[in-house]
Amino acid sequence: MGWQKLFVASATVAIASTLVWDSTAQAADLSYSKMYVFGDSLSDSGNIYNSSPQQFPTYYFNGRFSNGPNWVDYLAQDLGLTPTTFITQQSTPLPFPQIPTQSVNFAFGGATTGLDNTITQIAPGLQQQVQAYMGGLLTTNQTADPNALYILWAGANDYLPTESTWFTPPTTANQTINNISFALNSLLNAGAKQIAVANLPSLGQLPLTFGTQDETRLNNLAQAHNLALGQTINSLSQSYNAKIVSLNFASLFADAVNNPGNYNFTNVTQGCLLVQCQNPDQFLFWDFIHPTTEGHKLLAKEAYSALRTSVPEPGEELGLLLLGVLGAASIYKRKKSLDSLALSGKIVSD
């Protein structure tokens, strides 16, 4: 009777699961309570602008380092979130907030993965950004929201040539990866469970560096960085039993450079501003380093796709369930056959 009950119960679950297919599919869509962003100018949605005299060149859009919204803006829109900037108005020194009650973008243009910022010494690097968020948690004795999405993209300013007199770029990726690992450990130890980490494009392919003596060296650094970053992500994911999604922006940039026509680009080596272009949507880069808003759209699409892929499809879950039902049915059938044989005296039970 126990085996019969098991089979009936399993079949009932399978039927019920089929009936709620639509609601299961909806539940599998991306859903985060908040979004916290840490990084540099590629993700900054106005922090450097708001912490400065607010006299950015007019060719930068609303404090972004592009001609329009950046990838964080687009991704937030796709996720139905509206992160505010960490600095909401001109403020010196930087404020130390309480725990945010909404999504917050902590990214600052010029941030390195350490303590330095290559634009101004009063602006934070990645470590201070994470600690600013952590400070709010400590003040209120709370843990990180496990249902929030934490985004981290930094490292380019560690390696690229700089006019900064207080920061010297490293010659290897070791310290940069250690810095990123430290930031990730801080978030994970605080309770973060869903993190997205982006790797670096080939830094020798930027308008700033392409065709210069630094091209090969920077490409090699980016490659070493991405390899070590992938290993770090895998290790931390297992250690903390957390979901750390890798955003492979390196592959996307490489494909855009090698196959520009696939993305409707006609120029992937020069910044639109540098040649006074009339059609920025056909350019991958806006200036020496940063993508156009069209380029940022591609980044947001790639990020959303990576996040979406990390969520199990409803069909996968149902497939596993049905497999379990079939297994139960097989066991039940075998058990029934054995019972029949035992009753006929053809086998002897222990």
Language model: regions and residue ranges:
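Conserved active-site regions of diverse hydrolases
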Residues: 2-3, 7, 11-17, 21-315
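Compositionally biased, intrinsically disordered low-complexity regions
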Residues: 4, 65, 317, 326-329, ...
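Extended rod-forming repeat segments used as scaffolds/tethers
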Residues: 165, 233, 320-322, 346
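A cross-kingdom C-terminal cell-surface attachment/processing module
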Residues: 311, 315-335
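C-terminal membrane-anchoring or membrane-association module
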Residues: 329-350
